[in-house]
A protein has these predicted regions:
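Short secondary-structure boundary/capping elements
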Residues: 47-49, 79, 179
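A generic local structural motif
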Residues: 51-54, 83-84, 184-186
Length: 230
């Protein structure tokens, strides 16, 4: 390779590396201003999350808050999530469940698309309904190619009677992208390395079965001074 070719090659390499550094920096969302107390409570709508607040289920004035970081394609999530919701429903006067996206694309290639679908449904007031459908029917789309997966998701949107034009626009929107990226940044700050990961009043809690979920919630309720009626 002559000197001129080396110069051209070097310029190309520098440009590529510089571009990679730029992209990496752009993708590193800064949530350093969010402290640990805020991390374990509802985070409202703001520009970084596409003006989409945390999704809440249960008490609006909770004594116990469950933070769920999940990946819709994760088998463990599809088992644990309904149980966490069931326990929240049982103690709904005192317990709140907050869902945050944490799709792991390296092992679950359809997870982020599913997250976008749930967020798009949420923009039409149907987040939890879509959340339920995605988990309950995980086998129908988890290994599908993109076209088949999107057709399945569209059927869910139709089932929920969503405005399909808005749905189609929203799943590809910057708002939804920002929301998912923001949730993941919160998860990384929270120390999430795998899914599902649950925090009960800030404590990382193993959610391996419905009994352990309820036991952890009951313990937190007792610490908060809530009388539990059997």
């Amino acid at each position: 390779m002559n000197k001129k070719s080396w110069i051209i090659f070097s310029i190309i390499v520098v440009a590529i590396v510089g571009g990679m550094i730029y992209i990496s920096t752009q993708n590193r969302l800064d949530v350093s201003d969010i402290n640990n107390e805020q991390l374990n409570k509802t985070i409202g709508a703001e520009s970084r999350n596409g003006d989409i607040a945390d999704h809440e289920f249960g008490s609006k004035n909770p004594k116990v808050t469950i933070i769920e970081y999940a990946d819709y394609q994760c088998p463990g999530c599809s088992t644990a999530a309904p149980k966490a919701k069931e326990v929240t429903e049982k103690y709904k006067d005192s317990v709140q469940l907050i869902f945050r996206n944490f799709p792991i694309a390296s092992s679950h290639p359809n997870a982020r698309a599913a997250a976008a679908v749930a967020e798009a449904a949420g923009l039409q007031g149907k987040f939890w309904e879509m959340n339920n459908l995605l988990y309950a029917n995980q086998d129908a789309w988890k290994n599908a190619n993109a076209a088949d997966r999107d057709n399945v998701f569209r059927l869910y949107a139709e089932q929920l009677k969503l405005d399909l034009n808005k749905y189609k626009t929203d799943i590809a929107s910057s708002r939804v992208k920002h929301k998912i990226d923001f949730d993941m940044a919160l998860g990384r700050k929270h120390g999430v390395a795998a899914t599902p990961t649950f925090y009960i009043n800030g404590k990382n809690t193993e959610m391996d079965n419905s009994g352990s979920i309820e036991a952890a919630v009951k313990e937190a309720l007792k610490k908060a001074g809530v009388e539990i009626k059997n």
